[in-house]
A protein has these predicted regions:
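Short terminal alpha-helical segments
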Residues: 1-51, 117-120, 124-127
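Extended amphipathic alpha-helical scaffold segments
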Residues: 24, 28-31, 49, 56, ...
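Short, solvent-exposed, charged loop/turn and helix-capping segments
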Residues: 55-75
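Charged, low-complexity interaction regions
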Residues: 32-45, 63-66, 93-104, 129
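Phosphate-binding glycine-rich loops and adjacent basic patches that engage nucleotide phosphates
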Residues: 8-17, 69-79
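Short, charged, amphipathic alpha-helical segments
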Residues: 40-53, 69-73, 103-110
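Amphipathic alpha-helical binding modules
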Residues: 74-132
Length: 132
């Protein structure tokens, strides 16, 4: 039922998931750009690439299962929970020898995280609306 309701909304997959894919790719790109400034960056990159594979699969199949839809909500919580040490919300870099580079990097990372969070929230908001 949820899938049918969401499918009936014009271009749910095409618009929102393309934007989600682009935001994940942008976040991966900016983390890779500054990964030398944080030792555990590769773990974040791996997790985001796994997520990107799932997003691409949804785009390729143009189909969302009920499980995928309900998992989006918990995914958004885990990515942006400030109490979780390895959440994307807590990701930042630091170079004690170059504070200007640190500020520039964290500004770029912050913009990419905000874009990713905004579209993920938009999608989960639609999912939660249809689950009520």
């Amino acid at each position: 039922m949820i899938c049918e309701e969401l499918k009936s909304r014009k271009n749910f997959v095409e618009e929102d998931f393309i934007e989600l894919r682009d935001s994940v790719e942008g976040l991966i790109s900016v983390i890779e750009k500054y990964k030398d400034m944080r030792k555990d960056s590769d773990g974040y990159i791996r997790e985001l690439k796994k997520f990107l594979e799932e997003v691409n699969l949804v785009l390729e199949e143009k189909n969302l299962t009920k499980k995928e839809l309900t998992n989006l909500h918990s995914l958004s919580e885990s990515y942006f929970d400030s109490r979780i040490d390895n959440s994307i919300y807590s990701y930042y870099v630091y170079d004690k020898n170059n504070l200007e580079k640190t500020h520039q990097a964290n500004d770029e990372i912050g913009i990419a995280k905000k874009r990713f969070g905004k579209i993920l929230y938009k999608i989960t908001e639609k999912v939660m609306y249809h689950m009520i």
